[in-house]
Structure formats: C-alpha cells, structure tokens
C-alpha cells in the first residue's frame, strides 16, 4: 500500500522503542501473577461483541501491567508481532501535539508496521490488536476511537485513570465499547500473591438467576467457609 505522511521522527523512534516485538526483541518482564480481571479482558479483546474494551481504574492498580500482560499473552499464543501495537500516551508526551494522535499512529502502523490496512488484515483472518494506555492524557480520545472502530476492523483495548474524562468519553461510544472497572487488590488476590493460591469467586461459576434459589446462598456460605482460613491469613 502507498505510504502516507509519516510521524515526527522522535515519535516514530519512541514507537519502535516501546514495541520491541516488531523487531523480534523481548519487551519488559512482567509479573507471572495476573489480576482477576485478566481473563475477562483477554476474552473481550478477542471475542467481545464490542470492538473496543475500556479498562477504567485509579492509578497504581495495575492497568498498564495488565496491558503489557495482554500483549505478552497475544504473542505467546502465536499472534504475529507486527499485528500488535502498544501505545502508552503517558510515555510519548509529544503525541499530544498531533491533531489526531490515535488516528495518526493507526495510519502509520498500517503503513510502516502492519504493511496493509487494518481492514485487509482482518479480512485475511489476521486482525490487529491496538493497546492504547492512559488515554486520559488526550482530551479528544473518544471521537478518535469512535472513528477508528467505525471505519477500521481491529480489536482495541483502552485504559484510563481519570474517571470523569473516561466516563465522558465512554458516553459517546455507546455500543462500541465494553467497560471494565478495576480497583485495588481483592483479598483473594492478596492471598494469591502471598501464598500462591487465589480462590475463584463463587459468582464466577454461577448465573445471576441462581440468586433467587435459597440453595444458592447455602452453597455460597459453604464455598466461602472452605477458603476462610486462606482469607484470614491474607488479611493478617
């Protein structure tokens, strides 16, 4: 495909630096421990009804680490490295000087990394994955994301820390995004970090319809009692 206007050289250099997988190099090491939300994000990223997933949460709860873990998982599962893009807006401040940074980088990615349009890749059964980290640093991220998913076939993860700005943007993306909220570590996650065992949530194996059945609550009590000692040790 014909090359369009390139990005500023410093931005291009940062993109190559932050995506060493494009050159067959390893990225930063990530912890083996995965937060409870990882499996849900991985499923939504590939099979969710909406083309984009928005991960919201306060700072320091692991959103960036989750994005990196998802990137690693994609690569370990055999996704071609040049079908992936990791774009952390807090690490490339000069991106904010561009008129439409998300769309500008997406076009550059098509031309110089993917080697074809996002739609062509998807139609060939090789959809691209775009991981956009800390988008609250962009005032107009939502209109750009809307344009991207309306006109290009790709799977997108968006993370953000500023709840008001993320919420305002999400409202304009109805039907195009699935929102997932993540907070501080759960008690069972602390147990997983400290003792290597993280109890599965009872709701995870049950449907909300079960809540009307009294037996459901007796089973929930028994389920929680089985891991009571683990939770108490984690709390201590």
Label each residue range with its predicted role:
Residues 1-49:
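A short, basic N-terminal segment
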Residues 118-141:
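Conserved P-loop NTPase "ATPase switch" module shared by AAA+ and STAND
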Residues 87-125:
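Short glycine-rich substrate-engagement loop in P-loop NTPases that contacts/grips substrate
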Residues 64:
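Walker A/P-loop
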